A protein has these predicted regions:
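Residues immediately within or flanking Cys/His clusters that coordinate Zn2+
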Residues: 3-5, 22
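Surface-exposed cap/linker segments adjacent to membranes
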Residues: 92-123, 139
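Hydrophobic anchor residues at the C-terminal helix/turn of individual leucine-rich repeat
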Residues: 181-184, 203-206, 230, 252, ...
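Short, non-ligating residues that shape and space the ligands of small metal-coordination modules
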Residues: 14-18, 34-35
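Short Cys/His-rich micro-motifs in 6-15 aa windows
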Residues: 28-39
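Concave beta-strand-loop units of leucine-rich repeat
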Residues: 134-180, 186-205, 211-226, 235-248, ...
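Short cysteine-rich clusters marking metal-coordination/redox-active sites
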Residues: 8-11, 25-28
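Alpha-helical transmembrane anchor segments and their immediate juxtamembrane flanks
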Residues: 60-89
């Protein structure tokens, strides 16, 4: 072993090595530790050259051709691996993003489903939800409304669409998440009605709704987003949307079989409307669009609606010769209907808040079956309406002019003020809505006897209904709807011989001290009613009013909501009652319901009921 000289790092004194002793300076006593130095031996040959040095030439290594060939292959494999990995990650992300909701989560939507399927407190099944074909959800008058049908309106033009209104005040404070509608897998029509109370969801898809043919967007919903909702855009036939750019407008061309289009909002920068002629549109609805020149190219249109327009050039309407339905609302620069002469197939005309100076172009128009004039301005109708002999529906509201006699042999549905009734001869009339709020705020039931086929009567606005007993001579009259109506012949009203459904909203009844008796009426609604007993004070306390209705022994359903009802003792004789709507009252005791053998549904939300357990388990309680 070779040794090196050691000097003390402190005093520089010479340190001598002694076997098995630590290194210690003899001068300052500093101890030193040495780390063993391990030596590695390398077996190698060293060539020594003598003489004149040769030129310094660096030898090149041989090029490895296999390695050069393999490098790009490895790079390609790495790239493909990265691409496949990224694709899988993207696919997984999309799968997560497109995961759909199989059961609604909002309480209000679940309540609606439980009710229409008679589930009581049980959750609806996926199969039941999938059976709904048509669904429209909207928030109106602080209440949720659901229009629904179990029939497909695309295959059954007569599909019955029912309306369900939520009465619970707490439920009506809630919003519905758009993603909840993913659970309705059997829908062909989904309408979110541009409603603000429906919260949009970031990750929503309706691609699994394979039969969806019609969609109405929610509030301010981007069409760029809506366009991705459908797995097969060729199935879509109806859209109600907003358009904010020409690029969004161009997306409509991806829906080759689109037949009906409603543009509920269009941004000012949108101008490329002429591309719509590439679609086979049959129905078009526009709002707040002032340039209508491009309409001339849509010669196959059968239905057109224009709402709020400052347009001044209406010549394109002359080209719409196939039009069957036309609705114009607040198109204030339109003064004449000359273009109507080019619409020989027109069946329905709806004019609201218009400044038309005359309607002569409508005279003797045999194709017209439906006419609605709402606040038509200063136009004079006179005998024009009488010349429309094919009319089946007529609505005249907000019109203060005069009319001549109207003979309408085919008219089945009419809406007009009571002063026009003496001039209306319509022997086939079945549905009549009458306004009695003007100077002649009275309607005599005897005036209705000339409509022997009348089935439904609706009386609107504040007025007096007299001659009620005459209605017994109308054998088909089964439904009466009354709004803000005053009655002095109340006993006659509640003893009508043929009426099975009576709806009274904000009605005032004058009665004597004798309770009513009725064994014909099946459905009764009383909302915000008042009763004057004899010549005494008007009574609004519901518990004093309801004993007068104890003799309605044939009732199947009864509705009294948003009131102060406390006692249910009055309905002890209602042995046929099946459905009670008593939401938002002050009921605490339901003992009187125990002996009602046919009671199936009880709506009692908003009441402080203390003894609900006494009711039969078969009664569905909401």
């Amino acid at each position: 072993m070779e040794f090196i000289k050691l000097n003390c790092p402190n005093c520089n004194g010479k340190i001598e090595y002694k076997e098995e002793q630590t290194f210690k300076c003899p001068f300052c006593d500093t101890e030193i530790m040495l780390k063993e130095n391990k030596i590695y031996y390398v077996d190698q040959t060293i060539n020594n050259y003598y003489g004149t040095a040769s030129p310094n030439t660096t030898s090149r290594p041989k090029t490895n051709l296999k390695l050069l060939f393999m490098i790009p292959i490895v790079m390609i494999c790495l790239f493909l691996g990265y691409f496949l990995l990224s694709s899988n990650q993207t696919e997984d992300g999309n799968r997560e993003e497109l995961s759909v909701r199989t059961m609604p989560e909002s309480e209000v939507l679940l309540f609606f489903l439980k009710d229409i399927f008679d589930k009581g407190g049980t959750m609806p099944t996926k199969e039941e939800i999938a059976s709904i074909r048509y669904l429209a959800a909207y928030y109106s008058d602080d209440q949720w409304h659901f229009d629904y049908s179990l029939e497909d309106p695309f295959t059954n033009k007569e599909a019955k669409i029912s309306t369900h209104i939520i009465m619970d005040k707490l439920l009506n404070t809630q919003k519905i998440e758009q993603k909840d509608f993913e659970a309705f897998t059997g829908l062909t029509v989904l309408k979110l009605m541009n409603d603000y109370e429906i919260s949009q969801s970031e990750k929503v898809s309706f691609q699994h709704l394979e039969n969806l043919k019609s969609y109405t967007g929610s509030f301010n919903e981007s069409f760029s987003k809506i366009a991705g909702y459908f797995s097969d855009k060729s199935n879509v036939k109806e859209l109600s949307i907003q358009i904010r750019s020409n690029d969004e407008l161009a997306l409509l061309l991806e829906f080759p079989n689109l037949q009906s289009l409603e543009l509920s909002y269009v941004a000012e920068e949108v101008t490329d409307f002429q591309i719509l002629n590439k679609l086979s549109l049959k129905s078009l609805s526009l709002k707040s669009i002032n340039d209508l020149k491009w309409l001339s190219t849509l010669t196959n249109l059968e239905s057109l609606a224009i709402d709020i327009s400052e347009a001044t050039d209406f010549s394109p309407l002359y080209s719409l010769t196939q039009l069957q339905e036309l609705k114009l609302t607040s198109v204030r620069n339109l003064k004449t209907l000359d273009f109507i002469q080019n619409m020989p197939k027109l069946q329905s005309l709806d004019l609201e808040n218009m400044n038309i100076i005359n309607l002569d172009r409508l005279r003797n128009m045999s194709s017209l079956t439906k006419l609605r004039l709402a606040s038509p301005g200063q136009v004079e109708l006179l005998d024009m309406v009488n010349s429309l002999t094919s009319l089946t529906e007529l609505s005249l509201t907000g019109y203060h002019g005069d009319i001549s006699s109207i003979v309408a042999p085919h008219l089945k549905k009419a809406e007009l003020k009571s002063s026009f009734l003496p001039k209306l001869e319509a022997p086939a009339l079945r549905d009549l809505t009458v306004s009695i709020s003007e100077s002649d705020s009275q309607l005599n039931g005897a005036e209705l006897l000339k409509y022997p086929q009348l089935e439904q009567l609706t009386v609107m606005e504040y007025g007096i209904l007299t001659g009620i007993r005459s209605l017994n001579d109308l054998p088909h009259l089964q439904t009466i709807n009354l709004n803000e109506t005053l009655f002095y012949e109340t006993n006659d009203l509640f003893n009508l011989q043929h009426v099975k459904m009576l709806n009274c909203n904000e009605c005032n009844f004058q009665v004597n001290s004798k309770p009513f008796t009725n064994n014909v009426l099946e459905h009764l609604t009383l909302n915000d009613v008042s009763i004057q007993i004899g010549n005494g004070e008007w009574v609004q306390e519901v518990d004093k009013i309801m004993p007068y209705f104890a003799g309605f022994t044939n009732l199947r359903s009864f509705t009294l909501q948003d009131s102060s009802l406390q006692s249910l003792n009055f309905l002890g004789n209602w042995q046929q009652i099946e459905v009670l709507h008593l939401e938002n009252n002050a009921i605490s005791n339901v003992d009187p319901l125990v002996n009602l053998p046919n009671l199936k549904k009880l709506y009692i939300l908003g009441n402080q009921v203390q003894n609900q357990s006494v009711l039969d388990k078969g009664i569905m309680i909401y």
